[in-house]
Amino acid sequence: MADVKKIATRESYGNTLKELAAEGHEDLVVLDADLAAATKTGMFRKAYPDRHFDCGIAEGNMMGVAAGLSTMGYVPFVSSFAMFAAGRAFEQVRNSIGYPHLNVKIGATHGGISVGEDGASHQCCEDFALMRSIPGMTVICPADDVEARAAVRAAYAMEGPVYLRFGRLAVPVFHDAENYHFEIGKGEQITEGSDIAIIATGLMVNEARIAAEQLTAEGIHAQVINIHTIKPLDEEIVLKAAKECGKVITAEEHNVIGGLGEAVCAVLSEKLPTPVRRVGVQDKFGCSGPAWDLLREYGLDAATICKTAHEMLGK
């Protein structure tokens, strides 16, 4: 594939918050937990200091503050690393935001093992599972800059709690901003194919695209599906892909327990039993190292997707 521009989706998050405020959305406020430089909400703080609240390293309290602001008509975007937003503050997200179904948006950056050198303590590979388990919570993981920007706008526009996962790592921008349409709960078919379906989310969507290109050169035609909304899952596109291909691979930068793979398996086991293999973190903790090296080490790459396809197809 030709070289393309790379942007971290956390950058997309910060940029879009600033754009929304500039467009006159005065109800939008941003909260952070002493991480504005890393979550990229610092650019919002610089432009709108009276609408940015640094709650310090007290993520649970920050969720409570956001809940209170939402009851007064504001639309809070609460920002922290995924490990702290979904992990440390889970009780407050569940009880203060999820239970009353408040209009709070959680911008969780640094998701997955691509956090890199910070190591296992900061590499959250369990956030999909945690957030999916909260009734009424929408869970989104965009694949690139274009999709991330659209996701932030869609989250702002909808009523109810939303968990958005963004990455630290700069990833290729493959969507065309001019022609891209984003809809919460609707997947996107990226390539045609009838031999095997690859259903991916986040940075694994581009790896699925690369894998599909390599498989095509071998005469294997893979259908790539981008699932940006983990919950509610687009069951229609999953069932269509399974019916057309007969074999499914899921790919995610998350533990294979509780994430996209299990969500897909739940749908297929009940409605269209289909062989499925899950590419993801195989029930392990992360470790410290350069992000791309870790992705390869944990099998979160195009090579692993291709290998899995060969095994499923017996080729």
Question: Which residue ranges define each predicted feature?
Answer:
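Thiamine diphosphate
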Residues: 1-165, 170, 181, ...
